[in-house]
């Protein structure tokens, strides 16, 4: 029973996170990341989203791309 509560809380948090992504490009990026996570057979969570975003940030080639990923990471902690 407790695990269902945690899962629902996590799902709600992820839904709120997506709602905060106001730019279409942010939503596209989040969609790509979610697809990657699910295709890998992993659970979708803040931790998995953050890990993917940090990986992409590390491999970002330009300042705009870095700002984009930093903004998305920031949404996780609002």
Swiss-Prot record:
List the induction conditions.
Expressed constitutively at low levels, slightly induced upon entry into stationary phase at 37 degrees Celsius. Induced by 5-fluorouracil. Strongly induced at 16 and 23 degrees Celsius. Expression is partially dependent on RpoS, it is repressed by YcgE. At 16 degrees Celsius with blue light irradiation, expression of this operon is absolutely dependent on YcgF for relief from YcgE repression. Part of the ycgZ-ymgA-ariR-ymgC operon.
Q: Which GO terms describe its biological process?
A: cellular response to acidic pH; negative regulation of DNA-templated transcription
Tell me which InterPro entries the record gives: AriR (IPR024753)
Question: So which domain of life are we looking at?
Answer: Bacteria
Task of the protein: Probably a connector protein for RcsB/C regulation of biofilm formation, providing additional signal input into the two-component signaling pathway. Partially antagonizes the activities of YmgA and AriR, proteins that, via the Rcs phosphorelay, promote the synthesis of colanic acid, an exopolysaccharide and matrix component.
Query: Per its UniProt record, what NCBIfam families does this chain match?
Result: YcgZ_fam
Annotated protein name in UniProt: Probable two-component-system connector protein YcgZ
- What broad taxonomic lineage does this protein's source fall under? Bacteria, Pseudomonadati, Pseudomonadota, Gammaproteobacteria, Enterobacterales
